[in-house]
Amino acid sequence: MKEKRNINNNFDLGPDAWCSYDYHASVISGTNNFSLATHERKGGVNDSGFIWVDQTRWSADTPENPISILPLIFYRSWINEGCINLEDAQISVYLRGDNLQLDGAQCYFWVLYNDTRWHYTDIPLVLSQNKWADKPHLFSIKKEESKWNNSWTNLPNGPEPLSSVIKNCESYGFSLVGFKQEVTG
């Protein structure tokens, strides 16, 4: 039987290592450029803590196919944790955009392992506008490759198989994909 774990980012004390990825700054600096999310102690769901990021902290990641923005990214190593098995995981999330100009973009959950990223395109996530949703967006991780898109790999012989990435996930987050102009807000 698989061990069940509950990971809860409640943002009571801080941003729990959530960041944005700025691809263009990374190209200029020659190293990955992440900006820590801003933490607010109040104002979240039921006046809880929450985090926020905006377009000053992200840029389109042009090696991704399709081109993606990675506004919320979390590496487990940032909190001294190893990979996590997300097989059949249940995800519950509140996502909010204040004056967010999506320009056709959809929001997706993604996973990364061994220089390979897969976006869970079967479930576009709802971004409530200018207020918190009444209930969280709930979804389950499925291993069916038809429900995913391999957006990037740095491996010379092709991407890491989806099942391996889900089982050994070292990073996960939320992406914006399908925009005509870079998302702002």
Language-model features: locations:
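Exposed regions on extracellular, virion, or secretory-pathway luminal proteins
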Residues: 1-4, 28-29, 62-63, 127-131
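Extracellular glycan-recognition surfaces and repeat-rich motifs
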Residues: 12-59
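Surface-exposed intrinsically disordered loops and tails
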Residues: 28-33, 149-160
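Extracellular ligand-binding interfaces
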Residues: 67-74, 78-156, 183
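Noncatalytic modules at the cell exterior or secretory-pathway interfaces
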Residues: 164-176
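Short beta-strand-plus-loop segments that form exposed binding edges in beta-rich domains
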Residues: 174-184
